[in-house]
C-alpha cells in the first residue's frame, strides 16, 4: 500500500499566517512541473493545488480565475485567521458555531447553516476535496457527504486534525462518497504521514478502495 499522488496545497490567499502569495503561484507551478518530469516515470504524480478558505455563510471562497489557471486540484476548508473584505460575515461564521454550543437547538440550527455554506461553496466553485470537515466548526456530515457525492467532491480524512473522525466515517460509511487521506503537513518531515488517517479508516471499516490517493497492489 502506498500513496499514489501527492498534492502541494498551501493555504489560500486570505489566510494571515500561511496563505500563499499570488506572486508565488507561477514559481510553485514551475517547480512542480519540473519535479513531475523527474518523478512521473517512477509512478508518482505531484499536483499543484490550494487549500481555499470558506469565508462566510453564503459559501464564498477565496478563489478567482487567475488562481485557478495555475491549479491541478482545489481543496477547501474552514480556518481561523482569515482576512476578508466582509469582516462581519466572516466573524459570524467563525463565532456563531462556538457561542451557540451551550444551546442545543440553536447550535443545531447553526450547524445546518454551516453545512449549507459548504454545499453552496461546492455548487459555486470547482472544488475537488473538502478538508477536515467538522473541525473547528461542526457540520452535518451525513448531509455534506450526500451533497459531495452528488457533485463529485471528496472528503478528507486528516491526520493532523480530528476530522473526519471514526464516528464521522461510520455515519457516512454507506454513502458512496470518495475519500482522501491527508497529512496536513506544515513541516517537511510530516509530508505523507497519513498513518492516523488510515487508522481511523480501518477502525471504521472503510473499504480502502474508497480512498482515492492510496494505491493497493
List the predicted regions and their residue ranges:
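Extended substrate/RNA-proximal surfaces in nucleic-acid metabolism proteins
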Residues: 17-150, 202-210
Amino acid at each position: 500500500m502506498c500513496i499514489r499522488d501527492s498534492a502541494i496545497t498551501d493555504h489560500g490567499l486570505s489566510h494571515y499566517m500561511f496563505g500563499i502569495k499570488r506572486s508565488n503561484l507561477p514559481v510553485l507551478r514551475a517547480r512542480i512541473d519540473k519535479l513531475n518530469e523527474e518523478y512521473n516515470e517512477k509512478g508518482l504524480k505531484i499536483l499543484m493545488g490550494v487549500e481555499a478558505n470558506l469565508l462566510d455563510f453564503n459559501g464564498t471562497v477565496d478563489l478567482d480565475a487567475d488562481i485557478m489557471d495555475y491549479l491541478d486540484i482545489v481543496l477547501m476548508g474552514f480556518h481561523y485567521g482569515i482576512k476578508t473584505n466582509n469582516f462581519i460575515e466572516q466573524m459570524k461564521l467563525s463565532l456563531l458555531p462556538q457561542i451557540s454550543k451551550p444551546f442545543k437547538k440553536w447550535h443545531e440550527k447553526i450547524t445546518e447553516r454551516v453545512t449549507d455554506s459548504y454545499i453552496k461553496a461546492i455548487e459555486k466553485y470547482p472544488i475537488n476535496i473538502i478538508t477536515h470537515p467538522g473541525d473547528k466548526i461542526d457540520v452535518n456530515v451525513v448531509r455534506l457527504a450526500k451533497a459531495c457525492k452528488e457533485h463529485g467532491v471528496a472528503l478528507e480524512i486528516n491526520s493532523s486534525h480530528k476530522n473526519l473522525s471514526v464516528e464521522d466515517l461510520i455515519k457516512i460509511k454507506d454513502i458512496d462518497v470518495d475519500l482522501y487521506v491527508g497529512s496536513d503537513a506544515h513541516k517537511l518531515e510530516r509530508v505523507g504521514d497519513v498513518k492516523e488517517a488510515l487508522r481511523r479508516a480501518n477502525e471504521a471499516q472503510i473499504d480502502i478502495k474508497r480512498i482515492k490517493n492510496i494505491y493497493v497492489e
